[in-house]
Amino acid sequence: MARTLRAHGVTTVFTLPGGHILPFLDASIGEDLRIIDTRHEGAAVLAAEGWALATGQTGVAAVTAGPGFANGLIGLLDAATWSVPLVMLAGRTSRNRQGRGAVADVDQRAIAAPIAKWAASCSDAGRIPRYVAEALHRARTGCPGAVYLEVDSHAVYGNAAPLDVVPDGFPVEPSRAAGAPADIGAAVAALAAAERPLIVAGSGAFWSGAGTEIGRFAELAQIPVITASAARGVVPDSHPWSLGSLVHGGLAIPSADCVLVLGSAFNANVMYGGAPLFGTDQTIIQVDIAAERVGGNRAADITVIGDIAPVMRDCCEAWTATPPGREEWLDRGRALAGASLEFWNRQIDEHTGERIHAGAAVRTLADLIHQRFGGSATCVADGGDALAWALAYFRSELPGRLLTTTTALGTLGVGMPFALAAQAARPGEPVFLFTGDGSFGLSAMEVATAVRHQLPVIAIVSNNAGWGDVRYEQDELFGPGRHVASTLPGIRYDRLAEALGGHGERVERLEELAPALDRSIDSGVCSVIDVQTDPDVVSELLRMVAQLGLM
C-alpha cells in the first residue's frame, strides 16, 4: 500500500494510528512517505482535504477500523460535499471475523458508500496495488470527489509476493475533455452580445487549473471576474478585470445581463441561483465537467460540459469580436464592490464597544499579512461570523492560498487541520489561521500536532466567549438573552497553546495585535493569539443568511 501510494506521487499521509493499519504505517518508513499523525481521525481526514485545497493534489488519510473510521467520516463528508479529491483509507476487521463480535467490526463500506464518490473493500493482499491505484484515479476522474477504500486485516497483515505497484492500466490521466464546439460557440456569441457580462469562477476552476485561461478570456472579451470558494486566487484580486470575492464583487451580479458560471453548483453559497444574488432575466451560461452538476436550482440557458481549462481556451480561440469597450461596466462593478467594502468598514469604524471588533481584528491582520508577505502567505478561515469577516477582508493573489469552510455543508473545526496541511505542503512559507473560539475548540488539540511536526502555524482566535452565530439566532428567535448551550466563557487559548508546547499571546486592544503577531512569527513554533472580541458584534452576512432562511 505504501509503495503504491508513493509510486503514484503521494508524498504525505495524515493519520491516527490503530492496530488495523500498523503494517502500513511501518512500511511507510522505507518508502519515503511522510506520515503526519493528528490527535483525532476527523482532523486527519480534514487535513488531507486541506492538503488537496492547498496543492491541487489528491489528499490521502489513513484511519483504523471502527471508531477510527467513524471519527474520520466528517472529513469524508466535507470533501464529498465540496467535490475535493481525497482518498480515505481505512483498516477493517479481518473477513473471517466479521459478524462475530470482533474488535471494531463495523460494516464500514455500507456507511461510507452513500457519502463517497466510490467505496470499495479489499481483502486480498495481491490486489492492494490495483485498489489503491483505482482509488487515486477515481478521486480525480470527471468531477473530483472523496473516495473510500478499506483493506481488511487479513490483507494488511498477510504475506504477498512482490507486487507491481503500478498495475496495468494505471496511472490514468484525468480527462481534459473540451466542450462541444456548438455549445462553446453559443456561449461566446451570448457573451459577445451582452452589455454587462460577468464571470463567476467556482471551485471547479481551481481543480481544472484554469486561471490562465480565465484571465486571458476576461481580458480578451473585457468581462469582469468574481472568484469564489476554492477558486479564490485562480484569477488574482489584482487582475485588471477582477472584482475580487463574492462578498464584495457579488454585488455586481444582479446588474449583469449575462453570467458565465464556471465550476459552481447553484447551492446555498450562491443563493441557489436566485434573488437577491441573481436576477430572473439574465442569460445564464454554466460550464462544468459533470453534467449532473448543471442546473438544479437554477436552469442554465446555455450549458457547456467539459473541463474548464480547455473550454476557456477554446472560448479564447472562438472569440473574434472587436474589443467591446466594457470599461464603464468594469468601473460600475468596482464601484459596487467598493461600496460593499465601505459598508463593512463602517460597521467596524462605528463600533463603540470595549472589546475588540472581530472585523477590526481580521482587517488589521489582513493588512499586516499583505504588507509583510504580499500574496505568498496562506490564510485559513474557520467559524461562523469569524469566517464572514475573513471572507470580507482576506485578499487572494494565488490559487490554494485562501482555505475556508465555504461549503454548503457548513463544517466547523477545519481550521487547524487545513492550516497544518498547508504548512506541511509549504515549509518555510507563512500560514495564518483566523478562527472563532467555538470552531477552534473543535480541533484545538491539533496545536500539539503542529508543534510535534514543526509546523509553525499561527492561529488568531476571535474569542467572543461563545458560539456567536447560535447566540444571534437565539436572540432573534426566542428573545434577547435566552442563550442555551451557546456560551464559552473564560477560556485562555493562549495558555492552551503554551501547555501544548507552542507560543501563546493574549490581545485585549487592537494595537497589541501587530506586536503579538511579530512575536509569534519570531517564536518559530505553532502559536495561538487569543484576541478578546466583542460578543455583541454580528456581521451583515450573518444577518442576511438568517433573514433569507438559507438553511
Positions of predicted regions on the chain:
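Basic phosphate/pyrophosphate-binding loop/patch that engages nucleotide-derived ligands
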Residues: T141, F373-G374, V451-P456
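Short acidic loop-to-helix transition motifs that present clustered carboxylates
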Residues: H20, E41-L46, F69, A386-A388, ...
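Conserved short loop/turn motifs at secondary-structure junctions
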Residues: G202-W207, E350-G353, G436-G438
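Phosphate/pyrophosphate-binding active-site segments
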Residues: G126, E150-V151, L163, D281, ...
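Thiamine diphosphate
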Residues: L89, R97-A104, I253-A256, G295-N297, ...
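Generic recognition of flexible, low-complexity loop/linker segments
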Residues: L136, G185-V188, E213-I214, H248-G249, ...
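N-terminal alpha/beta PP-like core and its mobile active-site loop of ThDP/TPP-dependent enzymes
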Residues: M1-E328, F343, L368, P456-A459, ...
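Active-site diphosphate/adenylate-binding microenvironment
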Residues: M1-A2, R6-H8, L16-I29, A335-P417, ...
